[in-house]
UniProtKB/Swiss-Prot annotation:
GO terms for biological process: threonine biosynthetic process. Pathway: Amino-acid biosynthesis; L-threonine biosynthesis; L-threonine from L-aspartate: step 4/5. NCBIfam families: PRK05231.1, thrB_alt. The lineage of its organism: Bacteria, Pseudomonadati, Pseudomonadota, Betaproteobacteria, Burkholderiales. It comes from Burkholderia pseudomallei (strain 668). The keyword Chloroplast does not apply. The gene is thrB. This is Homoserine kinase. InterPro entries: Aminoglycoside_PTrfase, Homoserine_kinase_II, Kinase-like_dom_sf, Pseudomonas-type_ThrB.
Amino acid sequence: MAVFTAVSDADLALWMRHYDLGDVVAFRGIPSGIENSNFFLTTTRGEYVLTIFENLTAGQLPFYVHLMSHLAKHGVPVPAPVARDDGTLFGELHGKPAAIVTKLEGAAQLAPGVEHCVEVGQMLARMHLAGRDYPRHQPNLRSLPWWRDTVPAIAPFVTGEQRALLEGELAHQAAFFASDDYAALPEGPCHCDLFRDNALFAHAEPDTGHSVRLGGFFDFYFAGCDKWLFDVAVTVNDWCVDLPTGALDAARADALLRAYQTVRPFTAGERRHWGDMLRAGAYRFWVSRLYDFHLPRAAQMLKPHDPGHFERILRERIAHAGAPPETHACN
């Protein structure tokens, strides 16, 4: 999240006329993230998040807002879009599509333990299954076609060694994506960006036997229809990684994957290509972070991420790609 488009008090007052949310009590920008303009909004009716979409068009946005509404109705804890006075789930602010969603309970856990990974794994699988009957389709817009378009744009900014890695991994992933095995992998709506700062945890209720409770997943604006295994790989590459080295933390990875499979067991094809998908997940974010770092957009409060983090993760995944997935984690 970030602030690319400023919203004045007068802008907000006009915008809020289309909502039955009471009076505005507080309004402030959210500095984290890199894609949209986001604001915490407190009214006399509750707490919300206002998002102005900087890249998604009004034609693309229905997939995202209706997906969140669909998941919320199926018991998945996600922000629910708030309907406007005309019944629609988004409108236009400063010439850009914008929406208000409910604010989830809890706080991000930026140093997750095994117990957090268990909660995330189970809910991610529930989310995948809940999305099976979602009728709208939107591809993951940061997948192979985008990588092919973006790598030439960032190539002038990287070293020769990095360029060789970018182009070599792109060729590897293109071959994987073209394979029959890839085509057979289960798919459906995916979050595609489920990092530890896109989930919230609340205090567990007494006598539940749980030390933590997942408040929910949010920031679905990179979501798309993709292979479920890609969504799992993206999640594991963030929640279950040793930050200094990029290596997987075996205990957290085992916990997340076991928990996921209590809800949806992996297929044989998913187990076979776990290494390839871990590489795909790392590559996607290395490419996007290089792009955002070297070709940034003007923004208030923008905090770009370090591209080197996912370069390290990708190199780690390639170094261990020859090994089969650990049987204790993926059976």
